[in-house]
Amino acid sequence: MLVLRVKIINIMITNSNTNNMKNTKFPKLLILGNARHGKDTFAEILRDHMGLSFQSSSQAAADIFIYDELKVKYGYETPEECFEDRVNHRAEWFDLITAYNSEDRSRLAKSILEINDCYVGMRNRKEVEGCIKEGVFDYIIWVDASERLPLEAGDSFDIDKSYAHFILENNGTLKEFTKKVLAIGGLLKYDEFPNVIPVMVD
């Protein structure tokens, strides 16, 4: 068993390094965490600096089926409008995605990963466990901003950080968070960690 320790403050990544990384393929990633804790920001940083392709589970679900399910009920005119309003109906979205994945817990995840490196924002514990069982993801990353932001209600999110290979704290500034994200991104693109155990990156 490999024990990974990451000291973010001592890892320096230059612009030229990150530009070169855009030509290197990412492993398949799952980004987890409570609402508004920085999951999309994590993926956006890796996209902009290292070429990661990603799609949030909510955006994919809106495009694939939730817009059609809810457009009459809430008067949505586009999938984008449906997606933007998800914050007002999180429990309903949770139930719809759970139903969509009822016969295959990894159904939505596999659809997203057909054209992306990363799935952002899975919310159901059974779906995470189903994806782990099928080996859908190479690494799972948890983004944690719990020192400055509230946790999410259990009726729309029932996952905890115990599933993660990496736990990344986001309780400081955006600049600090960006350094941590780039450090982990560099490790994931250039090294292999076949038996990583969960660690806290702070």
Predicted regions and their residues:
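Hydrophobic anchor at the beta1->P-loop junction of P-loop NTPases
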Residues: 31
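P-loop (Walker A) phosphate-binding loop of NTP-binding proteins
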Residues: 34
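ATP-binding Walker
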Residues: 37
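Small-molecule kinase domains that catalyze NTP-dependent phosphoryl transfer to phosphate-bearing small molecules
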Residues: 107, 142-202
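ATP-dependent NMP and nucleoside kinases share a basic, alpha-helical "lid"
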Residues: 110-153
